[in-house]
UniProtKB/Swiss-Prot annotation:
Name this protein carries in UniProt: Membrane-bound lytic murein transglycosylase F
Taxonomy of the source species: Bacteria, Pseudomonadati, Pseudomonadota, Gammaproteobacteria, Enterobacterales
Keywords: Cell outer membrane, Cell wall biogenesis/degradation, Lyase, Membrane, Signal
One Pfam family hit: SBP_bac_3
Gene transcribed to yield this protein: mltF
Listed PANTHER family: MEMBRANE-BOUND LYTIC MUREIN TRANSGLYCOSYLASE F
Membrane topology of this protein: Peripheral membrane protein
InterPro entries assigned: Lysozyme-like_dom_sf, MltF, Solute-binding_3/MltF_N, Transglyc_AS, Transglycosylase_SLT_dom_1
Amino acid sequence: MKKLKINYLFIGILTLLLAAALWPSIPWFGKTENHIAAIQARGVLRVSTIDSPLTYSVINGKKYGLDYELAQQFANYLGVKLKVTVRQNISQLFDDLDNGNADLLAAGLVYDSARVKNYQPGPMYYSVSQQLVYRVGQYRPRSLATVNENQLTIAPGHVVVNDLQRLKETKFPDLSWKVDDKKGSTTLLEEVISGKLDYTIADSVAISLFQRVHPELAVALDVTDEQPVTWFSRLDDDNTLSAALLDFFNSINEDGSLARIEEKYLGHGDDFDYVDTRSFLRAVDNVLPELEPLFKKYAKEIDWRLLAAISYQESHWDPLATSPTGVRGLMMLTKNTAQSLGLTDRTDAEQSISGGARYLEDMMAKVPETVPEDERIWFALAAYNMGYAHMLDARSLTVKTKGNPDSWTDVKQRLPLLSQKPYYSKLTYGYARGHEAYAYVENIRKYQISLVGYLQEKEKQEAEAMKLAQDYPAV
């Protein structure tokens, strides 16, 4: 997966151009016969989406997702409530628009020339490529030339069908596929993993997140180049909704909240390590159950799964782990840190976890209040790894190089510079292994994503097994 970046310049320019073109007809807060006025009169913004880790999901009763958070902010911007409808596949999403059951589709949908003939696109805020996937250990196709409908299944409404048709007409005449009208992309990915299907096609971001939980899913080849992702509304609407969307995206670009959401959901790095992810998930099954009660006990305000991910990064959940520099235990605490926390045995699992949690809380408390709440943890983790003083240097360097010291996206880009003499020689606290702190935080984020997704999958499987047992007729 290529590094994803929101096209801020495009959003800004497009906002100005469309606003100039549309403004005479759309003082949308003043008219009553337009879409925005209708939404505000109704008091509800209706958004249809797909259940996926990136777009929208519910974990322990809390809603997550890049598209969900953006949609919630847009609803707040309009001064209305948000109503989310979850559909199984893309075809059902566009049915909602056609039938007047949705104002917007916010589901990681790709901008496509065929779609824009019938639907109104919004701002394009990140990009993906479409990739053909297979299961590790099975035959990997190197080209679409020999792929046929007995091997490749696509979800209904998937935009890649248009790309496949063009490729069939221009390069691969024997290429064929089938569309399963009853299954969405997530289900098809699961069937590739289970061996029920040979291949399917999904977007690169969805695949990247899926691999954190299912490392046996592998990319065979790119089917398309990078394609922009956007929201869609009805084409026959007036322009008030489009203008409001453009103004909204421009405003969250300017205040930095768009970049923060991008960092939260797309900033976990592109590098997927099959062996490391598989080893981690094995440890989740075999080692974590014994330690889980302790992580839950001492996490307090921190997500216990994040605390567990930190511990795995530190020690691979080995209570006796020792580094060449003398740090020890599950949380790899120094002797001085352990003593300051009142710990007597760093190799005792409970003492180490409780001490590590308290030390992280101390780092969190030191992070300046100007740092947004949902990014404070990343600053704290970098400080946990390399020391708070060096985090101050990283923030100072970010200011000197015209970045935002309260933005984790900006600060993390400067961390590797802390080990380069032209930079650290001019900083208050000198040399630091900033590149290690950068990798440290990125790895923890990946482990947390894997752990959250994997545990959610297990809960789903257990619930389905329980239901099956309850429904099974007694004999």
